A protein has these predicted regions:
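Conserved S-adenosyl-L-methionine
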Residues: 109-267
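Preference for the N-terminal adenyl/adenosyl cofactor-binding alpha/beta module
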Residues: 1-167, 226
């Protein structure tokens, strides 16, 4: 499954960066579009790509530079990472820290600790976590549907490691889907645990409806345009990975486009 998901992620990233409709949506600045009455793209707000800081990110950038032209922070040159940290205090959070803080938020919401995983600190200083085996339990007065729709915001989100944890933001090392700890990852787990898995039309529609609600419930903000794009793309890829794990294939293009529309509105 890991190899399949790796292949799927590469396929979705290719679509996100080459398909006109999907890419144009991921680049759309919804705020400026609404204020000005005409379509506007998110701005670079950084000089590292040889573009004017206030210039919009255009589709042609990927056509001219290639689909790998925008890469995660961890894959950027060390000097560039240092410059971004000095200029805008950009510091990304390791996944184990995101997990511990998300665990605290869930403990407050659910009223119980370690609902999704238990954290482990090895003698060598490496931090790990073990996913819980039993389904997540909900307190009286709250249901799994409430959890899926509960709103969460990551401010100065960078590549949104608190929302989705496809990879560790500090190392770019991929994280198996079973060990992901982002807010949206947790919502997808809850959906899988509480909806039927038999691949009927009705069951797929139910899962999709709840999954879209989950995507609609997470918000993020960042100053730099490449971070905004990477965050949007990561949520889109995560959705497709969970869809494929559940139903054995990637979602069709209209569904991918629908998710892109939602993601462009919440980040």
């Amino acid at each position: 499954m890991t190899t399949t998901l790796d292949s799927l992620a590469a396929d979705i990233i290719r679509i996100a960066r080459t398909d006109h409709n999907v890419l144009s949506m991921l680049l759309c600045d919804q705020t400026l579009t609404l204020l000005n009455g005409e379509r506007r793209n998110i701005s670079w707000l950084t000089h590292e790509y040889g573009q004017d800081s206030l210039a919009p990110i255009r589709e042609s950038f990927f056509q001219e530079r290639g689909i790998d032209a925008i890469s995660p922070r961890a894959l950027k040159h060390e000097s560039l990472r240092t410059a971004r940290s000095k200029a805008r205090a950009e510091v990304f959070t390791p996944t184990w820290v995101c997990n511990m803080q998300n665990n605290l938020v869930d403990e407050c919401w659910l009223g119980i600790p370690d609902a999704f995983n238990t954290t482990l600190a090895r003698e060598d200083g490496v931090h790990e976590w073990q996913p819980t085996i039993t389904p997540v339990r909900f307190p009286e007065g709250k249901t799994w549907k409430d959890y899926v729709k509960s709103k969460r915001l990551e401010v100065a989100c960078g590549e949104a490691p608190y929302l989705v944890s496809r990879y560790d933001a500090t190392t770019a090392c991929p994280i198996p889907i079973s060990h992901r700890v982002g807010i949206l990852d947790r919502k997808f787990r809850v959906i899988d645990e509480n909806t039927p898995s038999e691949p009927t039309v009705a069951n797929k529609r139910l899962w999709l409806r709840k999954a879209l609600q989950a995507v609609q419930s997470v918000y993020g903000y960042d100053w730099q345009g490449d971070n905004v794009f990477l965050s949007r793309e990561s949520i889109l890829v995560s959705f497709c990975e969970y869809y494929a794990r559940r139903w054995g294939r990637r979602p069709k293009l209209p569904t991918i486009m629908k998710v892109a529309e939602i993601v462009a509105a919440v980040l």
